[in-house]
């Protein structure tokens, strides 16, 4: 009787685990995950390249001669234009991974926070659900625990989760005071206990560079600090946020939006190549690449975003790594949302975030290809 009762209890326990999803996620090849964001970079540029109506001074605010701007970024064919603007995204990510969000081909990616600006977007992607309380970029410390803070509680990731971003508000979005995550944000001077001449030069550049504004450091300065950190500290979970595409959009400088977008693509390639050249990252690292919100699509609306600018809810998501099937540009698929990013980040490193946080959206379907045993 005792043996039979024990067997029954064991069977019930196993059934409960399967029913409620408490079993651990299946492990794939990914051991390191990187979420990369280019702030306010529209899906239109991602999928069709430079907008011909904005390649001028009148509508695009360009200071660069129109002929030179067209030489750099214009081609008659949309596929050629987008590859010219984003050579890594279309030459590597699209060939070896997947990209969602081309609405002209039946792929919709969108935010669900109803606000379509930065803090609500970063909260949604990092915690897995929108929070109506967060209705301003000046909201203050995030009351929600992000997937990055959550992963940092696991022994295998503790102390190896980092936030690198150009915007100083990331300190609040990822709640630096509570989470204790390693962060390099805004114009905060990079600091190392044992400073090399290279480190001293970088600090000097931070101190002497003329600031675009007091909140956002230049993408290029952050990139140097980021690459050094990756080489020295070997983080396993990493967030990287680049801000210039949004900054120049608000300034109405479409020429510099394109320059920043092109350099963003270069920075992502540079980070990928750097990590793939390191044994601890080679063949075991996944990149998720996206934006926090879209923008308007008219001759003046492209400069702004938010509830009053139609289309600002539309985003794009790219995934590249050893567990992602090379399906390329996704077409005629179910819509995906910004809220799904948090659980997707966790799933790639074998953690079931949606089970732990029931409000969180599930992982993006089809990007994690792990054979079941």
What are these regions (language model features)?
Residues 34-35, 43, 264-303, 345:
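Metal-dependent active-site segment of extracytoplasmic phospho-/sulfohydrolases and closely related
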Residues 33-37, 44-45, 100-103, 124-126, ...:
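Structural recognition of the beta-strand scaffold that forms the well-ordered cores
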Residues 176-178, 224-270:
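Active-site His/acidic residue clusters
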Residues 10-21:
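Bacterial N-terminal signal peptides
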